[in-house]
UniProtKB/Swiss-Prot annotation:
Pfam families in UniProt: LIM (PF00412)
PROSITE patterns assigned to the protein according to its UniProt record, in alphabetical order: LIM_DOMAIN_1, LIM_DOMAIN_2
UniProt keyword Repressor present: yes
Annotated function: Acts as a transcriptional corepressor for snai1 and snai2/slug and plays a role in regulating neural crest development.
Protein name: LIM domain-containing protein 1
Record keywords, A-Z: Cytoplasm, LIM domain, Metal-binding, Nucleus, Repeat, Repressor, Transcription, Transcription regulation, Zinc
GO MF entries: metal ion binding; transcription corepressor activity
Chain residue ranges for the region called Disordered: 308-336
UniProt source species: Xenopus tropicalis
Compartments, as annotated in UniProt: Cytoplasm; Nucleus
């Protein structure tokens, strides 16, 4: 508890103002933006990290079980993996013996850096070997450059997790390995090296997981998988005849718009005391339709590791694979034994093409649907036009007795309604709307046909001048006029298209002159009673058969305005207008006299 209290006090120094802190890349600390150059802060951070690492190692050592053995008549095989104190040193022990340390700059080859020495009894046994794991293990992954031979291997340490939640980890590893394998760009070339087993071939692994299991000549029995972290994982399994190291890789199915293919190689059975590493991997290669021209192909052969003897009929297997991403280097990890040779057989490498799934073009829909839609729209427009034209109904044509719809189809002449196509010249069938026409004996003629056909002898005469109307005719009051002859009798203004009036003597007047001449005159002021300005209505007062302006209708004695009110009523006497009081006075004076 004292340790944790001390750590909590030191940690509280970092969290004084949360707004000034941001998460660091390693996820262990929170760094003050303003204190990046503070030496005291850096020293405190280093001490805090060292104490956390120390407590972590102490908890790990408490959980490490002692190395045990499996007693019995069968094989005695022990495997112990321990967490190194630093990344520079990766010890792996088998039966108490540790492999040579892996340095940071110069790394030894497979044979020198990683040795597997299992102790297997020759006698048959039914008991299972003791397989021991620690909470965390380290995996050696060779780091190589693409396109160069690998005379000596460089290794990086990758942290693994405990073999719990097997199914969930297998799915997570599969998704991570799938994305890591898509970063391969070109082949890893391996120079052939001839040693004890010249027929064996090896190449750097793409992703690996080690399986220690028992194997017979015909099949592989039950296997216990211990899935580890990405992209490689170590799986252990018991064996009775020999130990087989195989490489597995979990893959998940693609979904969405990507497509892929999987190539899987099975594990071949071998003789006893053999250690094999074969690629049991299913590479899921994503294929993007938009970048199909950027696909590059690459192959990697299968690799087999033999610890001692191998049968003559065993042949290495090769797994060609392809990758779509040509910008990333392939991650690799390799396990080795005493007699591992790295060779390459370029003659057996074959390039394969990615299976492209052609997208079936959906057949274009026939034009029948578009035509039907167009017909429906056309019918709708026709219905709207019909509804609009029916609203502009003018009447019935006197010639064809059919309805006239729309102002552009109506023509009115001589007080009758015609269609434009019905009001035509009787001789040449020319449309006469807006043109001069002649009506002779119930027929209509255009001007040319009337002048040169002799029909003018029977044409109408002008009511004013008495001459034949040879051009346009103006009809009013049942009579025919020349347009120039139809004028006001007072001001002589042409009344063609202007309102006019006629008196009892059939004299034509404009409205203004009619009111001046024919309007009634006021009995009081002797002026004509005209309509108000801007209107055609005339307002007057009639009393004793006389006409008066409204303002002139007053008492002649006191000039009181007379109207229908009680005190303003008119009391005429002897042709004079009087109010009630003046009327009484006039009667009294008349009686006295």
């Amino acid at each position: 508890m004292d340790t944790y209290e001390e750590l909590s006090l030191e940690a509280s120094k970092f969290i004084q103002d949360l707004t000034l802190y941001e998460a660091s890349k390693d996820g262990l600390f929170r760094v003050d933006k303003g204190a990046s150059n503070n030496p005291e802060f850096e020293e405190t951070k280093r001490i805090f990290a060292a104490k956390m690492a120390k407590i972590h190692l102490q908890n790990q050592q408490k959980n490490i079980p002692d190395t045990g053995t499996s007693e019995g008549n069968g094989s005695n095989l022990q495997y112990t993996y321990s967490m190194p104190k630093s990344v520079e040193e990766v010890p792996v022990t088998y039966n108490g013996q540790s492999s040579s340390s892996v340095g940071q700059s110069d790394y030894k080859t497979y044979r020198e850096s990683y040795k597997v020495k299992p102790e297997i009894d020759s006698a048959d046994s039914s008991e299972e070997p003791v397989i021991r794991h620690e909470h965390e293990t380290m995996l050696l992954s060779p780091v190589s450059k693409v396109g160069h031979a690998i005379p000596s291997q460089q290794f990086t340490c990758k942290k693994a997790i405990s073999p719990s939640n097997e199914s969930l980890e297998r799915e997570r590893i599969g998704s991570e390995n799938m994305h890591s394998d898509l970063n391969l760009s070109s082949m890893i070339n391996c120079k052939p090296m001839e040693k004890n087993t010249p027929h064996n071939k090896c190449s750097p692994l793409i992703s690996s997981s080690v399986i220690f299991g028992e194997e017979t000549n015909t099949h592989i029995p039950q296997q216990k998988f211990f899935n580890l972290s990405s992209p490689s994982s170590i799986n252990l399994q018991k064996t009775s005849d020999h130990v087989c190291l195989s490489e597995t890789k979990a893959a998940k199915e693609f979904n969405g718009e990507q497509r892929g293919f999987c190539s899987t190689n099975s594990l071949n059975s071998g003789s006893s005391n053999d250690v094999k590493l074969s690629a049991l991997s299913s590479y899921c290669v994503g294929y993007n339709e938009n970048s199909s021209d950027q696909i590059k192909q690459m192959q990697a052969p299968c690799y087999t590791f033999n610890s001692g003897h191998s049968s003559a009929d065993e042949q290495p297997q090769e797994i060609p694979f392809s990758c779509t991403d040509s910008s990333a280097e392939p991650p690799a990890s390799t396990l080795d034994s005493d007699h591992i040779d790295i060779v390459q057989d370029s003659s057996t490498l074959m390039k394969i093409k990615l299976p492209c799934q052609t997208l079936s073009q959906s057949s274009k829909q026939g034009s029948s649907r578009a035509e039907k839609k167009l017909e429906a729209i056309t019918r709708h427009l026709e219905q709207e036009m019909d509804a609009h034209t029916r609203a502009d109904y003018f009447g019935t044509c006197v010639k064809c007795s059919k309805g006239v719809y729309g102002a552009n189809q109506a023509c009115q002449a001589m007080g009758n309604l015609y269609h434009n196509g019905c009001f035509i010249c009787s001789a040449c069938s020319r449309k006469l709307r807006g043109k001069a026409f002649y009506f002779v004996n119930g027929k209509v003629y255009c001007e040319e046909d009337f002048l040169y056909s002799g029909f003018h002898q029977s044409a109408d005469r002008c009511f004013v001048c008495g001459h034949w109307i040879m051009d346009m005719i103006l009809q009013a009051l049942g009579k025919s006029f020349h347009p120039g002859c139809f004028r006001c009798a007072v001001c002589n203004e042409c009344l063609d298209g202007v309102p006019f009036t006629v008196d009892m003597e059939n004299k034509i007047y404009c409205v203004k002159d009619y009111h001046k001449i024919l309007a009634p005159k006021c009995a009081a002021c002797s002026l004509p009673i005209l309509p108000s300005e801007g209107t055609d209505e005339t307002i007057r007062v009639v009393s004793m058969d006389k006409d008066y302006h409204i303002d002139c209708y007053r008492c002649e004695s006191c000039a009181l305005e007379l109207n229908n009110e009680d005190d303003h009523r008119c009391y005429p006497l002897e042709g004079h207008l009087f109010c009630h009081n003046c009327h009484l006075k006039y009667l009294e004076n008349h009686n006295l006299s």
